[in-house]
Amino acid sequence: MKKIALSTLSLALLGAAGAAHAQSSVTLYGVIDTSLTYVHHTDGNKNLWALGNASGGDLSGTRWGLKGQEDLGGGLAAIFQLENGFDPSNGRLGQGNREFGRQAFVGLTSQTYGTLTLGRQYDPVVDLVQGITADNYFGSAFATPGDVDNYDNSSRTDNAIKYLSPTYAGFQFEAMYALGGVAGSTGSGQTWSLA
């Protein structure tokens, strides 16, 4: 009888531990987008085989990353994302030779109050507007020349403080302010964005 009670208690505790563990997560993800290119008679009578697209025209940036969430209770969770971009043909880092040059942020999220993040991240135009096209190569017809609005998803913002509202009656907004990072000049290099 004691063995059955102890076994039942052990199973109940194991189940409770599994439920508590399920509330937190860390995900490893990635995309390798490369190509094998053959060009006939590139320079006189030479043929060219190359790994990767020499013009940089692969459809999606190669990347790997970690993202996670830790439940803090009361509907609040801590979140983070670290995303590395690299060239799959030679292993070189992208985004100015940064280890996590695509994204590197931490934050808090709540279904009631929204999400606040701090770090290197995309601006609100990329998060809420750019997604209506498949990618920046075919969707660039909607971007402004020179990508001054970052709709073409060509830049990330350092030192950014970003807030994403919860959805109210089908409406959601996102606002961002990025510190300039110029010592002695608080307004120099700052970024504002709203979508």
Where is each model-derived feature located?
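Gram-negative bacterial Sec-dependent N-terminal signal peptides
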Residues: M1-Q23
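Outer membrane beta-barrel
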Residues: S24-Y38, W49-G180, S188
